[in-house]
Each structure stands twice: as structure tokens, then as C-alpha cells.
């Protein structure tokens, strides 16, 4: 499945499957960290979270659920900058929350409008980690 040029390499699992005539169900892709094959459920979740394929030495990789959560937590611990309420996030970015893609700090899923609203109405902070604002999705809330 090696590709010739970086510009022609698919950046999503959907595009990868389309280019190679596969379905997410029968896609065999390894985790970038642990090198285990993703299960069908993990491949669907990776696609649903709109995460990108990582290319290494001409081969595509994704991230299994365990490694994605583990390395997200490591990243949060190492690169946490600050926390702020929604109005500060809007003020700093110059964009309304609904115009921004804010991912869950744990599972990396883009937060839905209702998940962003949960932060607003319940006084929850967003966290600035690695130069981007993150929050917590419904499944990963403490």
C-alpha cells in the first residue's frame, strides 16, 4: 500500500479506503504507536473523530483507542498551558465557539455544539494544550 508522492497520499481513512477500493470494515491499518492492527470499531471511531492518517516510510498508520487516549493524556500533562472559560476562548481566537473545531482532550473527537454548550452552562473550562483549545466530550467527562 506504499504511495509514491506525499501530495497524493490520502489524509483520511475514508479517502484511503476509496483510493484502494476497501471498506472501513476490511481495512487493515496499524497503530502508529503500538503497531497493532486497529479493530473495525477502532477504524470507524477514528473515521468518526475525523482524525488524519499518518504516513511513515510510505505506509499509512492510525491510532488504536488505547494509544490515542494514553498519548492524549501524556500530551495534556506535558503541554498544558492554561484553562479558560468560553468567553476568553472566543476573545483570544476572535471566533465564536460554534465556528471553532475544539477537540476532546482525551479521545480527540470534535466537540458537538451541545458539548460546547455543556462547558458554557456548567462553568467548565476549556484547556489550551499544544497551541489549541480542547474540552471534554460527553463520554470523557470526569
Curated annotation (Swiss-Prot):
Give compartment(s).
Host cytoplasm; Host nucleus
Matching Pfam families, A to Z?
E6
Please provide the Gene Ontology terms (biological process) for this protein.
Answer: DNA-templated transcription; regulation of DNA-templated transcription; symbiont-mediated perturbation of host apoptosis; symbiont-mediated perturbation of host ubiquitin-like protein modification; symbiont-mediated suppression of host innate immune response; symbiont-mediated suppression of host type I interferon-mediated signaling pathway
| SUPFAM superfamilies in UniProt | E6 C-terminal domain-like (SSF161229)
Predominant localisation class: host cell
Q: What else is known?
A: Belongs to the low risk human alphapapillomavirus family. The cancer-causing human papillomavirus E6 protein has a unique carboxy terminal PDZ domain containing substrate but low risk E6s do not possess this domain.
Assembly and interaction partners: Forms homodimers. Interacts with ubiquitin-protein ligase UBE3A/E6-AP; this interaction stimulates UBE3A ubiquitin activity. Interacts with host TP53 and EP300; this interaction inhibits TP53 activity.
Name of the protein: Protein E6
What is the protein's species of origin? Human papillomavirus type 32
Amino acid at each position: 500500500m506504499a504511495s509514491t508522492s506525499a501530495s497524493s497520499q490520502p489524509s483520511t481513512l475514508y479517502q484511503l479506503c476509496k483510493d484502494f477500493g476497501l471498506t472501513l470494515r476490511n481495512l487493515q491499518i496499524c497503530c502508529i504507536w503500538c503497531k497493532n492492527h486497529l479493530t473495525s470499531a477502532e477504524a470507524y471511531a477514528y473515521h468518526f473523530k475525523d482524525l488524519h492518517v499518518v504516513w511513515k516510510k510510505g505506509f499509512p498508520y492510525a491510532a488504536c483507542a488505547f494509544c490515542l487516549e494514553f498519548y492524549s493524556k501524556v500530551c495534556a500533562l506535558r503541554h498544558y498551558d492554561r484553562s479558560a472559560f468560553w468567553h476568553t476562548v472566543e476573545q483570544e481566537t476572535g471566533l465564536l465557539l460554534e465556528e471553532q473545531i475544539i477537540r476532546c482532550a482525551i479521545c480527540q473527537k470534535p466537540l458537538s455544539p451541545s458539548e460546547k454548550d455543556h462547558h458554557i452552562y456548567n462553568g467548565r473550562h476549556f484547556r489550551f494544550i499544544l497551541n489549541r483549545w480542547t474540552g471534554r466530550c460527553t463520554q470523557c467527562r470526569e
